[in-house]
Curated annotation (Swiss-Prot):
Name this protein carries in UniProt: tRNA uridine 5-carboxymethylaminomethyl modification enzyme MnmG
Listed PANTHER family: GLUCOSE INHIBITED DIVISION PROTEIN A, PROTEIN MTO1 HOMOLOG, MITOCHONDRIAL
GO biological process: tRNA methylation; tRNA wobble uridine modification
Gene Ontology MF annotations: flavin adenine dinucleotide binding
Source organism (scientific name): Caulobacter vibrioides (strain NA1000 / CB15N)
Keywords: Cytoplasm, FAD, Flavoprotein, NAD, tRNA processing
Binding residues for NAD(+): 270-284
Gene assigned in the entry: mnmG
Keyword set includes Coiled coil: no
Cofactor(s) it depends on: FAD
Record bears the keyword NAD: yes
């Protein structure tokens, strides 16, 4: 006997949590199917949320009423704004997270979400009927039916843990891998590959000589992730900082053959920007030390995560090299590090909605798409969950543009270019990063989220009130002006050019502050911190933002030129076989997306455009 839903989400990690929550918020009857209820929201690797680029994604998830930012605010134990001394566009909110608090907060959130059922069962297969997905089957043969299914399997697809000579089939330590789902995807003809990632040993904090370490404190005034929160009530802690030594490197170099990559046993590619300590020793042989952050995993947990030394060497070697590190001479290990290899699906198999092209109704989100990181997974989960719900309701899909959100940048990169290594978000990936700031994600996305039906009433009311305050402040800032003579009399150095200057123009002068202007226009002092920050940023970036808006408008013209879904590229005779093959593989939805496919030349785009226009004229 089977029960039916509108949407089934398989997997309770970060992508699955956001997918289930978004689908339910958008009005779809949703089932979250996960192998263990107690591991929903588990932070399998590092105990942190946010960072450069990643913090932007968390803010965008939050602006669309997702859950990650609010849960991180409930569990954050060391908030820091990265790149604080640099411009607002590249600042990134980050926090160490208490694993238990985060997991408990996420579970409480999901268990209290309307439209959402949660069942503990290991999905083993998909139900496919008439060329479409129709549900899933668990290991016991129980069927769960839905016209939309979202796979958020993380590292579980044929996952294998490597530690020295040990090879252990697992999705993560203590959990069985998902074999049947992987076999089904291969059987359906999906283009798939292997990737790998790694994690360091977990250390017993009671055996660390903390007094010998450098200390990294939290910010004095923590900045929350969620726009709904204005303060952090969780106690804040410091992290320790230490360094590897030449002796550390000697031990690792002597035993490099134990490492997955250097043993020749690796079948998957690892993340370039999160290399193992073995990789660091080999690739940066001239360096005599590497920095390690010792990050407590919780307020009442002695477990410490040594960020910077993920490894796959044997337990014996791990303990040997750990005890050559200052402060860790007497350290005891709670759990040893390991590498894990797993299957992923080439994300060029997906539409920008994250629905698969090969099997209608099936959506993929998270590491199954070749990404790495909680934040990247959560953002994809939200998009997949939202689009699955919209599809069930017969509504237009939600596709986020590159000039609209980092979410749009990431998904466009994935579905257009694919991946050759685990994909991580950086601010440098965005062409419009002055516009796509962490501080204005709600301004970019909350109205759209409301229209899509994925933003609930509490956030909608909070955003509407904030938007009214911002609009009033901007209107006031443009309505009041100073002549050059008035400005000089007030103590400001401006050109005597006869031009009247409003608040924005005055703030463009580096030595003029809002407090200075408040002495002339007291209204300024009534603005709260959020409003003041936005006015200052918009004034500082005014000229640059205008240019980026023009560039974005130019991009939109290409994005607005839709390509037929059934376009036969073989009919375009002037295309090379290579370009024709790439276009057929990706099947871009717009001319803009076609232009971003590697190897597609301007000449090919011209031929493509001419062919489409001829077809429309016929």
């Amino acid at each position: 006997m089977s029960k039916s839903w509108d949407v089934i989400v398989i997997g309770g990690g970060h992508a699955g949590c956001e997918a289930a929550a978004a689908s339910a918020r958008a009005g779809a009857r949703t089932l979250l199917l996960t192998h263990k209820l107690e591991t929903i929201g588990e932070m399998s690797c590092n105990p942190a949320i946010g960072g450069l680029g990643k913090g932007h994604l968390v803010r965008e998830i939050d602006a669309l009423d997702g859950v990650m930012g609010r849960m991180a605010d409930k569990a954050g134990i060391q908030f820091r704004m990265l790149n604080r001394s640099k411009g607002p566009a590249v600042r990134g909110p980050r926090s160490q997270i208490d694993r238990r608090l985060y997991r408990e907060a996420m579970q409480a959130e999901l268990f209290s979400t309307g439209n959402l059922d949660i069942i503990a069962a290991a999905a083993e297969d998909l139900i496919v009927e008439d060329g479409k997905v129709a549900g899933a089957v668990d290991a016991a043969g129980q069927a769960y039916r839905a016209p939309r299914v979202i796979l958020t399997t993380g590292t579980f697809l044929k996952g294998v843990i490597h530690r020295g000579e040990d090879r252990i089939p697992a999705g993560r330590v203590g959990d069985q891998p998902a074999i049947g789902l992987s076999d089904r995807l291969y059987g359906l003809g999906f283009q798939m590959g292997r990737l790998k990632t790694g994690t360091p040993a977990r250390l017993d904090g009671k055996t660390i000589a903390w007094d010998r370490l450098e200390s990294q404190a939290a910010d004095d005034t923590p900045v929350p992730f969620s726009y709904l929160n204005h303060r952090i009530d969780v106690p804040q802690i410091a992290c320790g900082v230490t360094y590897t030594t030449e002796e550390t490197h000697r031990i690792i170099a002597e035993r490099i053959g134990e490492s997955l990559v250097y043993s020749g046993r690796a079948t998957g590619v690892g993340p370039r920007y999160c290399p193992s300590i073995e990789d660091k020793v080999v690739r940066f042989a001239d360096k005599t030390s590497h920095q390690i952050f010792l990050e407590p995993e919780g307020l009442d947990d002695d477990t410490v995560y040594p960020n910077g030394i993920s490894t796959s060497v044997s337990e014996e070697t791990q303990l040997l090299f750990l005890r050559t590190i200052p402060g860790l001479e007497q350290v005891e290990v709670i759990r040893y590090g390991y590498a894990i290899e797993y299957d992923y699906v080439d994300p060029r198999e997906l539409y920008p909605t994250l629905e698969t092209k090969r099997l209608p109704g099936l959506y993929l989100a998270g590491q199954i798409n070749g990404t790495t990181g909680y934040e990247e997974a959560g953002a994809q989960g939200l998009v997949a969950g939202l689009n699955a719900a919209l599809a069930v309701q017969g509504r237009e899909p939600a596709i986020f543009a590159r000039d609209e959100a980092y979410i749009g940048v990431m998904i466009d990169d994935l579905v257009t270019r694919g991946v050759t290594e685990p994909y991580r978000m950086f601010t440098s990936r965005a062409e419009f990063r002055l516009t796509l700031r962490a501080d204005n994600a709600d301004q970019r996305l909350s109205d759209r989220g409301i229209s899509l039906g994925v933003v609930g009433p509490v956030r909608a009311a909070a955003w509407t009130e904030k938007k009214a305050r911002l609009d009033a402040a901007r209107a006031f800032a443009r309505s009041v002006t100073l002549t050059p003579n008035e400005a000089v009399k007030a103590g400001f150095k401006v050109n005597s050019d006869g031009v009247r200057r409003d608040v924005f123009a005055m703030l463009a002068y580096p030595d003029v502050t809002l407090d200075d202007l408040g002495r002339i226009w007291p209204e300024v002092f009534t603005w709260n911190t959020d409003v003041r920050e936005q006015i200052e940023i918009e004034a500082a970036y005014a000229g640059y933002l205008d240019r980026q808006r023009a560039d974005a408008e130019s991009l939109r013209k290409d994005e607005d030129l839709r390509l037929p879904a059934d376009l036969d590229y073989a009919e375009i005779g002037s295309l090379s076989n290579e370009v024709r093959g790439k276009l057929a593989r990706v099947r871009p939805l717009t001319l803009g997306q076609a232009a971003r496919i590697e190897g597609v030349t301007p000449g090919a785009l011209t031929a493509l455009l001419a062919h489409v226009r001829r077809g429309r004229a016929a």
